[in-house]
């Protein structure tokens, strides 16, 4: 029985406090792969923490990234949008906060991380964040997006991606414009990235979110969620093998 532990990690960016969550199996003492998890637009939440715990139980150290600041914990969609949009519109700022989370994952001394085995994954807005972090040339062996947007202001940055990319997309997702898919494919192909895009038929936005219940827009789909997480774990097993 794994003993998954959650600890707060508080740090500053430009004088502002951020509080991420470090999630790991306390029974494992040897260095293990480290993952930065970018949550959906609701930020650090109980739901995001549950996902981080599930992933960490597979033998990873997960840093659930606070991208808004310790004082910002959205309680509804309007608050989430107000916190998210400045980052969506300023990818340099977004990447600064993602890199800070990656730095914290590697520098913390609570759970031993193998710094040669790093990856990022995220959900919705967080999927965009994981891909953008990869586009900066961060030392990631994999970047995984669950029902995230695929656009980037600088498609040429795809050439900076060092690892493999996995996009898990709902074919019926109305919140990811269809024109983003071929643009993303072109970006990846032009950059020579090892990439996979899986489009799940009948799946809407937020298909991994157990609380998503907005018919025709955002809907939890357990079957698709299970397949998507299995795909991520398959990729992580591949890139982290010795």
Segments (PLM) and residue ranges:
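N-terminal cap/leader regions of alpha/beta-hydrolase-fold enzymes
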Residues: 1-242
């Amino acid at each position: 029985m794994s003993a998954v532990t959650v600890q707060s990690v508080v740090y500053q960016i430009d004088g502002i406090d951020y509080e991420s969550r470090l999630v790991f199996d306390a029974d494992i003492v040897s260095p293990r792969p480290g993952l930065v998890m970018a949550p959906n637009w609701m930020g650090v939440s109980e739901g995001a923490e549950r996902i981080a715990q599930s992933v960490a139980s597979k033998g990873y150290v997960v840093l659930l990234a606070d991208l808004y600041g310790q004082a910002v914990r959205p309680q509804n969609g309007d608050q989430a949008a107000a916190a998210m949009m400045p980052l969506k519109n300023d990818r340099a700022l977004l990447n600064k906060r993602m890199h800070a989370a990656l730095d914290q994952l590697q520098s913390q001394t609570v759970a031993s991380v193998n710094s040669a085995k790093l990856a990022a994954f995220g959900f919705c807005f967080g999927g965009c964040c994981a891909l953008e972090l990869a586009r900066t040339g961060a030392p990631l062996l994999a970047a995984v997006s669950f029902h995230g947007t695929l656009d980037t202001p600088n498609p040429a940055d795809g050439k900076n991606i060092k690892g493999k990319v996995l996009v898990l997309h709902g074919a019926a997702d109305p919140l990811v414009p269809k024109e983003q898919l071929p643009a993303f494919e072109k970006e990846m192909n032009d950059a020579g990235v090892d990439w996979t895009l899986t489009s799940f038929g009948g799946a809407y936005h937020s298909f991994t979110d157990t609380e998503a219940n907005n018919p025709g827009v955002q809907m939890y789909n357990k079957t698709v969620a299970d397949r998507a997480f299995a795909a991520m774990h398959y990729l992580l097993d591949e890139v982290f093998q010795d």
